[in-house]
Every structure is written in structure tokens, then in C-alpha cells.
Amino acid sequence: MRIALKLRHQTWVPSFVTNFFGKELGGGRKKEEELHGKAVKVLDLLHHAAELGHTDALYALSQLHLFPPNQWFPPEPGLSYEELSSHASITGNASSQALLGFFHATGYKDIVPIDQAKAQLYLTFAGHSGHKGAQMAMGYRYWSGIGVVEDCMTALSWYEDAAEQVMAKFMSGPPGGRTLPLVPAKLSDLEGGVFGPGASVASTGLNAARPVIKTANARAAGEKWDDLLEYYSYNADRGEVDFAYRLGKIFYQGSIYGSTGGIASGGDGASRVVRDFHTARHYFLRIARQVWQRDPPNPRQYQTPKEKNPPSAGYAALAAGYLGRMFLRGEGVKQDAAMAKMWFERGAEYGEKESHNGLGIIWRDGLVDGKKDLKKALTYFTAAAAQDHAEAQVHLGKHHFMRNELKQASVYFEAAVRSGSPFEAYYYLADIQSSIARNPATPAEIAGSSCAIAVSFNKLVAERGLWNDNLLEEAEIAWNSGTDRGKELAMLKWWVAAERGFETAQNNLAFVLDQDKSILRFTRFAPQSPSNDTARLALTQWARSAAQRNIDALVKLGDYYYHGLGVADEPKTTRYEKAARYYQSAADTHMSALAMWNLGWMYENGIGMPRDFHLAKRHYDLALETNTEAYVPVMLSLIKLHAKSLWHTILGGEDNLNLWTFEDAEGGASHFLPGTLRLRC
């Protein structure tokens, strides 16, 4: 039996055997029966409480039926809709109304027909009751014209309400604000982009250096973060200070890759690791002790050395900045502003920017003995901002913003955005642009531009501040479970988030539903015919993602119209023309070599646009200029194009299909005469 229990962990053993071992020999079947019994009991108790008029039990039932937490609770979206309807009618609860709006907006599982008017009604009530998700959904609907006429100012009002909630939550945290959630990853990015590495805009050019693409490359190479951490630990234990510092950063931010902009900017969600403040402090303290062997009995008695040009502290100064921040915020240690100030002063001796920023917060807010000194605070913030520290630039911008010096404030906020600020700077810039848009004296064209900027920035703030109801993170966990039930739950959560305007959720949902991945689609080996309903849903999500500046999604839209996926009822001519327009829109960004190649092929074959070999060659050339990885397909296409043109010219053609001309000695053009061969484009 011991041997059998060990065999169940071997990958070469058939799954039906390991399942048997797990259930029969490991006691799994008995445990399953116990858990199933507990789930039935929970549902029975909640049903009984709901029948007795307990509205919280009614809402809990609706959540269990719509978002079952595990396999013991079966999904029952139809029951969930009925329970949400009852709960909303009895209590007017905003959360129930928001989910009812989702059902009517999407027609999920055909429980109710799609009715955008009813969706609008439920979401409006929920939004006015303060439900942030409903406010975001309303803002997105007015911004995109879903069920309503596009109205930027109305969209701005809804997104402002959501962003204000998020900012209030952010400011309720420790000094410096709450820790930002990690940036969620797109499923397609983890595979090198929608079209794979090399062909997708998401993984070519400057985008190839994005943390999520580095993570995708690491996964493709079979690397695991546990192996990386073990390697770093091995080198750190040998006294390699740079590896110890990297480990401290990784465990502090809970991610292998941090965002630009400083400590406060968060990290990448694709390279997530378990966050461990105690381990981070261990490594930072080990580094710092190489310069500061001991601490004074009273940190308030610490005095900065008078030496004007102290020797370089290297990583110790950087570690001091992190240690000061941890004491300032109570992360892994007891919150102690005096200790924080001591560590910040140590780092500031060596000009470390995080330490300058931390001292600015302490003096501005009077966190040590209530002593405030705005002049000192501004001096420290300026020193950090001069080193492109995003958070310090935000603090300087806020200082001018509070004094109504909006022009100077904008300068600092814009500098913070360039330095990598992912949150606060956008909030205040949105407020400034909103005031411009609402000013009656502002010209209409400027007001419209300011409104669009304000909506975009408020939307970004509302979507980043997900400390509660983080649908993207919950969906990621469900998807990574690997079970069919988990994947179905993940898609539901992405769908809810997509209706609230999250481009990541729209991309994920479209990518999962995408039926145009197989290169065999148009051969006799093609898989079964795609579902037009599923393709239509994917097309909708691709369109919404493309409208939020996802270039690969824009190319996908062209593919769907070209292949007739989700638009089978439209005539081919119309579909090809629309496909060409989408490819052209993507090509105009000068980032998608694939879109340019597609356009070249359509010009070459006269599909969706007039046949023109000159424009075909031009787009093939542009594809290669945009992405050198397109060398092989572009060269093959050019060879074929010139062969076609040569045959056309031999037959006497002289129109836009003739790429071949000869220049005679007089400089005139003639065909097939001695002279210098020139390819014309």
C-alpha cells in the first residue's frame, strides 16, 4: 500500500489508476462524501433561513449558485437570478442590482433575453447606491455607446464617482497609501500575444521587454520561480549582496518583476510569488548591517554623521530605504515612525531617493512627535523628484494642486506619469482635465479632448484600485485550477469584469472563445464548424478590446470579418472591405507587421480593395521594416509578387500590376530593352 501511495505521484502512471489510489487508498472517497454532505447541509440551512425571511441568507444563496466556491456547490445561475431578483426587490441591495444588470446586458446562459434597457435600469440604481462596479459599468456604457448614446460628460460623472471611492480607500491605508494590487496579466500575453511571439504587437519591439512577456518566455523555457528563488538564495548566502537585494525586493513586492516608478508602483501579476515581509526584512537588514552595525537605544537620538562626502554605501543605502518604508507602514514589523525616520536618514546620507521621499512624508504629516515642517518636506521631495522618483513628484504636484496652482501641479503629475506612477498622478490629472471640460468658457473641441482624457484617467484609477471584489484575480485563480468548473467560473468573472470595462477581461474572454487559432481551419483537416454564437460573443469582446487601444485585437477583428466568424450573414464583399479597414487601422499605428502583411496580401489578390501590386509591395516592405522577424514570410511574398508581375508584364500588362520597368540611356522608360533594371514602387 505504501508503494501504491507513492506511485500515485508518478506522471507515467495512467490517470484512472492514480484517481483510484487517491480515493480508495488515500481515503479520498470518504473525504469527498464528507465534503459533499457539508455542502448540502450549508445549502439546506441557508434555504431554511431564507424561507424565514433572512435576506442575508438569500443573498448568500445567490452567490453560491452563481459563483460556487468549490466543486461541492453546483452552479445554478437560473436559481441565482431568481434569488437576486427577490433580494433586490426586498432590500434594494446595490450588489444584487448590479448582477441583475449583468444578466440582462449579456443574456448569460439564456436565463433572460438580452435587454439593454433593463440592464441600464438596474445598473443605474446600483450605481446611485454607491456600487463601484455598477458605476464603472455605467461609465463604460456611456463611453462606448452600449445601450445608450455615447456621452462623454455622463461617462465622466460615473467614472469620477468610482475613482473617488478608490482614492478614499487608498488614502485610508498607512502613510503613503494602500499597497497597490499587482498588475493583472492577459492570458494571451502569457503565450506571447494573441498571434504568438514574433507576430503579436504584444511581444515585439519595445513590448518584448515587458515583465509579462519575460514571464511568458521563462515559462516557455520551462523555468519556475521556485528554481529562480533557490538560485538567488544560494548566491545571497554566499555573500553576493546584489542577489540578497533582489530577494528582498521580490519578497517585499510579491512579484519577480517590479513596476517602474519606485517601491509604491507595485509589481507584475504574472510573476507573482508569496509576499513575505519578514523574509524581505531579513535580507534588507543583512545588507544594511554592513554599513550600520547597530542601532542607537533611542532612534530619536540618531544623528546624521557630519562627514560631507561619505564613502559609497552601495546596496546598503537602497536597503535602508526599504527598511524605513517597512517601519513607516508597519509591514512585517511594528509600525514605528521614529525607526522609519532613522533608516530614511541613513539612506538619505547617500542621496537614496526612497529615503528622501520617506523623510518628506514624515515631515509633511508630522509623524514623529507631531512635528511638521513643510519646508523640510518639500526639500526632501524635491531631492527625490530630481532623481525621477514618481511618488515624490506626485507629492510635489499635490502640494501645488492644494494651493490651486494647477499649471505647476500638472507639470509634476505629468513628470510622475513619465517616471512610472501608475495611480495617484492619473487621479489628479483627471481632476484637472475634468475642470477644463466643465468650464463653460472652454472651446468645444478642447472640452471634448479634456473630457476624453479625464474619462481615460479616472477609468485607469478605478480599475487599478481593486482591494475588494477583485474579479480579475479571482478569475485567474479559478482558471489556474485547471478544472472545467474552474475555467467556467473564470470566464463568468471575466465576463462580469468585461461589462465593467476591464480591457484585460475582454481580451481574456475573447482569447478563450477564439475559434480562429488553427492553421488547418481552411483545409480538409479543419476542426468542426465553429459556433456562430460563440464567435459573435468573441467578436464583441475583440471589438471592445480593440476600442481600448489593443492593436492585436484590432487585427483579430479583421480576421473575423475576413473569415466570416460571427458575421456569417454579411456578404463576402462587405466583410472583406471591413476586414481591410480594420487591418488598415492597425497598420496605421506602425506597430503591427501582421496587419501590414495582411494588407499587402489583399492588395496583391484584389480582395477587399482594388488589385495593386505597388501597394502590395509597399505593405510587405513596411511589415519587414516594422518587425525584422517577418523576414521569411515577407521575402517569400515578394518573390511571388514579382513573379506574378513579371508574368503580367510579359503578357503586355502596363497597369498597377507592373512592377518592372527598364531605363534606357536617355532616361526614358521602356520594357525589355537593355539598361538598368529598376523596381518601381
What are these model-predicted stretches?
Residues M1, S62-P74, G101-V112, G139-V149, ...:
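Short coil/turn linking the two alpha-helices of tandem helical-hairpin repeats
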Residues R2-G37, W72-P75, I114, W143-M153, ...:
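Short coil/linker segments at helix-helix boundaries
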Residues L46, L84-S85, L123, Y159, ...:
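Hydrophobic/aromatic packing residues within the alpha-helices of TPR/SEL1-like helical repeat arrays
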Residues E51-L58, F67-P69, I90-Q97, H104-K109, ...:
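Short helix-capping/linker turns of helical repeat alpha-solenoids
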Residues L58-L61, Q97-H104, Y122, Q135-R141, ...:
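TPR/Sel1-like alpha-solenoid repeat signature
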Residues N93-S95, F102, V112-Q116, Q120-R141, ...:
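Catalytic cores of eukaryotic secretory-pathway lumenal/extracellular enzymes that build
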Residues Y234, N627-C681:
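Terminal, low-structured helical/coil segments at or just beyond the last alpha-helical repeat
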